[in-house]
Amino acid sequence: MFDLPDIAVVSVFHTKIILFHFFVVSSQTECVMFERMSLTTPLDKYIADHSSPEGDYLYRLFRATHVEILAPQMASGHIQGRLLKFLVSMIKPKRILEIGTFTGYSALCMAEGLGEEGLIYTFEVEDELEDFTRRWIDGSDYASKVKFIIGDALEIVPTMGERFDMVFIDGNKREYVKYYEMALEYLDEGGWILADNTLWDGHVIEEERQDAQTSGVRAFNDLVRNDDRVEVVILPLRVGLT
């Protein structure tokens, strides 16, 4: 059983930033605002059956992640992966920065949507994931479009001399504010920022939850909500986005 994560999308138009929170809520934690639904319910099966398929390679990667890797629920999965591909196909970025590769599922989904000149730089700080993730990225049809880097994006990106059209934040929740600030610095005008897990299993509304990760996500949400360049729209993705 696995759950779809939360996702936020930021779009930069001139000096204006528009932020959308696309979210689904995990069944792992009670939340008074939303009914929890895992991808084992009839409705979830209907959603999957009526969405574009992920393809055999991504399916095998997702299965291998669940068999071989600790905390496999961190992988994006079918529906979020199709959304990422859809957004990339629509936005048409030339350079994508991903912070938090995990096993490469999301990077490969985004790579599917890239044009001929598109390239993804994806960073992962957990070096124990390197062999598994590099094997799956290098074995894919999109290996030439994905630059997989082990290391801290906060330290390496400023040394790269690159600009990005799109940034996907899915790394250490404690560092989300730093990732956001860095993303804005290296994002071209008209670029997009996506941030995953912005509801953090519903913990963001639980006042008793004061752990570093929950606090990091809250700080990010508060920052973008109060940034005068940002408009915030919360959309219940699981209720129906085709």
Regions found by a protein language model. Give the residues of each.
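A short alpha-helical cap/connector motif
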Residues: D3, A8, I17-I18, F22-M166, ...
